Amino acid sequence: MNGCVMLAWFVIFFAELFHRENGFKVSQRQCLWSAVTFVPAAYLSLLWLFEQGDWVLVLSVLLIVWGADISAYFCGRAWGKHRMAPAISPKKTFEGAIGAYVIVIVFFALTYVFCVQQNVFTNYLFDNAGFLWGVGVLAMLVALSIAGDLWESMLKRLVGIKDSSNLLPGHGGFFDRMDASLPVLPATAFIMLWIQLIVH
């Protein structure tokens, strides 16, 4: 179920994002649909991941999100020239996204080599799906984290606000810190479930 929700959300979001040649436009109904399905899916996935492992497993998944976010920001500032979605988030660039892919994959490849902790998600992924498949899955999760960030920016622009709340001054609000994890958590849960059912 999580995988179906994630896939449907991802397809609809990017279809809307790139279909419009004269600027981004999305309906309130589509935003509401994505919010009421994806936020609960992310929460349930978080609980399921805790049941499968412990805080190390969950933290390792969130490190993918945070690593992609930080890497995309600094790589975008250093080399960004081509904007990804200027109507939604003018500062996001394709160069930043590529930098995020490379840094996250290299970091977790090194983690796999030097860290023997089995509860780390990427170690579990590489051990059970193979290194090449693991790299492909990591690239997909980075793409989903960027999509989640863009989705939250889209919602804010739709309602005409800059920050989602005042809870974390200077960071755009609590939701701004968690937006990228919303699609990643269901995707991670789906991947682990697939490995358990198909690979094992």
Residue ranges and their predicted role:
Residues 65-81, 85-86, 94-95, 143-185:
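Acidic (Asp/Glu-rich) catalytic motifs at the cytosolic membrane interface
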Residues 113, 190-200:
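Juxtamembrane boundary at the C-terminal end of a transmembrane helix
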Residues 105-106, 184-187:
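Short, charged low-complexity intrinsically disordered segments located at boundaries
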Residues 1-140:
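Membrane-embedded alpha-helical bundles of polytopic integral membrane proteins
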Residues 120-128, 171-173, 178, 197-198:
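Short, conserved aromatic-histidine micro-motifs
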